[in-house]
From Swiss-Prot:
The lineage of its organism: Bacteria, Bacillati, Mycoplasmatota, Mollicutes, Acholeplasmatales. Its main location: cytoplasm. Its EC number is 6.1.1.6. This is Lysine--tRNA ligase. The keyword rRNA-binding does not apply. GO terms for biological process: lysyl-tRNA aminoacylation. Gene3D superfamilies: Bira Bifunctional Protein, Domain 2 (3.30.930.10), Nucleic acid-binding proteins (2.40.50.140). One of its GO terms (cellular component) is cytosol. It is found in: Cytoplasm. Mg(2+) 1 binds at E403, E410. Belongs to the class-II aminoacyl-tRNA synthetase family. GO terms for molecular function: ATP binding; lysine-tRNA ligase activity; magnesium ion binding; tRNA binding. Keywords: Aminoacyl-tRNA synthetase, ATP-binding, Cytoplasm, Ligase, Magnesium, Metal-binding, Nucleotide-binding, Protein biosynthesis. Homodimer.
Amino acid sequence: MKKKISEQEIIRHQKMNELKKINIDPFGKKIVPSHSIKQIILQYQKEDSLAFEQSQINVCVAGRIVLKRGQGKAGFLHLQDFDFRIQAYVKLDLVGKDAFQIYQNCDLGDIIGIKGFLFKTKTQELTIKALEFIHLTKALKPLPDKFHGLQNREDMRKKRYVDLIVNEKTRQVFLTRSLIMKYIRNFFDNQGFLEVETPILQPTLGGASAKPFITHHNALNCDFYLRIATELPLKKLIVGGMNKVYEIGRLFRNEGIDATHNPEFSTIEAYLAYADMQDIMDLTKQCLQELVQKIFGKLQFTYQNQEIDFSHFAKVSMVASIKEKTGIDFTDHFTLEQCLSLAKKHKIEVMPHFSQGHIIEAFFGKYVENALIQPTFVYGHPLEISPLAKQNEFDPRFTDRFELFIVGKEFANAFRELNDPIEQEKRFLNQLKQKQLGNEEANDMDYDFLNALNYGMPPTGGLGMGIDRLVMLLTDTANIRDVILFPHCKNQNKFI
């Protein structure tokens, strides 16, 4: 099937051929800019006209044409690199007839180079007066116009390269994402953690409760999982004597897509030997407060019209939060039958593998989670839903585990790590029973991890934190796919 081509594209192809006729490569050669547009703006924007008259400041820049105006023997254009743009003035008498002809024929979206000097117009706009106009790349497709192009969010996600060109908001989101990644990495480096890399392809499913992607390793002739967590390999490194480790990377969960879930997502996981749950809580709070302070210059900001305050992190047990909303006290020793009866009364769906702990979690999800707007540590998760966490010393039905909730969503999951290999094996066996009852998110038996624990793992605290949701929060973005450069979309590989 022959692809359709618009009238504008036909004209642009003709212009490409015209460039070839005069021995100009439509797709350009190397240029060495003296400055980025950002450097020019930051360095010279505040200078007055007199400064440019007293000393000629020569520059060479490259960028994409995003605006063009003027007729006759002179005109203006705006060049954009990524996060900054600058005006250029192109005049026939200065650049010469041949170069001016190329300027007249150029289109929005073309990439060009300008050599010239800086001045300020009568309206005090910083401008480059062109002495040379250099064609670099012909854009064969037109950019969407300001009012009618790329209005559909799904189109923006499919064609992120166009979205980045035309939408400043998108550019700012991904610049901020890069800063967030850098700040997080610097924080853990400065705390003395060692950054490591662990395999994406895993022979055993474990480290979290999730449905996996499965692939086949031809050379080894066996199936592998795309990792759903980095937890177990990182804890093996704790056994090996790496007492402070972290990894920033991609995880994969073969589950649904919605505003806060994407099957491929980024996390940081960090593990600290000789630490407990409170230590990890303090570490998480310090990391996030420093991050918010660096992004906003203060600890308060707005997300989706809600004022969020990071100066204080609340702390509440899971069962206490449920009691506050429902009056039900799950610290009472309810039987499974009593819990099932309560679930039925409160119209909570129950799966065949559900235990008391699963029902407690379901109550929390229905009555509490969405109401946790300000930063809140929720601790004391039931044992049955926490197969890798250590039991609480005072009530072994619960664990020394916490999750961080903000704006009604989970942002971090952490616990005092279970380091007893005998107890861990029992937990894995229970997970296998849950899988037989239909729990698709249950873990496998990881014999190598058990073997590692038998060599002795020191008391350890661990943290997993989602980076994409953090970027959403700190850029006031409502959908997770708008903070991922190339999210998965339907019909993504069509030529459009």
